């Protein structure tokens, strides 16, 4: 949405008259209109987000999710909205499959393709967990960043290895989310159990 707004502003500016522009020109009126529309949409989005946070802040699952590094209010709301009750998944592998983060290999006869993410699950949930993982590895010290650093330690410049590391972090984020909700305990850094 922001990209579209910026693209519209850019196109308006590109087709407008160069400086100096008369204060009552059509180009300036159009620019102000687009800018006002963008500000209005941002204000509406903020109101919706604030209301959603106010409604869910007392929910125990919401509080548990926000204890995980990288998961803020919007990511927690998205996870709860897209996944529903995570306790319905008996094992974290079922939740990974629901997210589309399970590994799949294409096979036919004797041919065996590469193993990669199936991506058959919920794309919004997968994207949210991916973004939460990105934020978590940017924070100071936590198990997500530690795993990412270990993963790319062999070759820091290898983009393919980085992409695999990001996928591994997103899958770890999904497992952590499932475990925390299932057991009802807040996130504990570097706890493997």
Put a short name on every predicted segment.
Residues 1-193:
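A detector of single, family-specific signature residues
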């Amino acid at each position: 949405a922001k990209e579209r707004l910026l693209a519209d502003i850019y196109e308006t500016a590109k087709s407008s008259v160069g400086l100096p522009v008369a204060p009552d020109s059509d180009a300036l009126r159009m620019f102000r209109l687009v800018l006002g529309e963008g500000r209005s949409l941002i204000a509406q989005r903020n109101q919706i987000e604030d209301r959603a946070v106010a409604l869910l802040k007392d929910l125990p699952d919401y509080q548990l999710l926000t204890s995980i590094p990288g998961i803020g209010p919007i990511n927690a709301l998205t996870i709860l909205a897209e996944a529903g009750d995570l306790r319905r998944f008996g094992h974290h592998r079922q939740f990974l499959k629901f997210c589309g983060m399970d590994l799949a290999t294409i096979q036919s006869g004797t041919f065996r393709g590469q193993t990669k993410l199936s991506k058959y699950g919920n794309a919004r949930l997968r994207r949210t967990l991916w973004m939460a993982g990105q934020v978590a590895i940017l924070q100071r010290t936590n198990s997500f960043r530690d795993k990412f650093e270990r993963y790319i330690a062999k070759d820091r410049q290898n983009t393919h290895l980085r992409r695999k590391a990001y996928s591994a972090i997103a899958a770890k984020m999904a497992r952590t989310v499932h475990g925390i909700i299932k057991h009802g305990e807040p996130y504990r850094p570097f706890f493997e159990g």
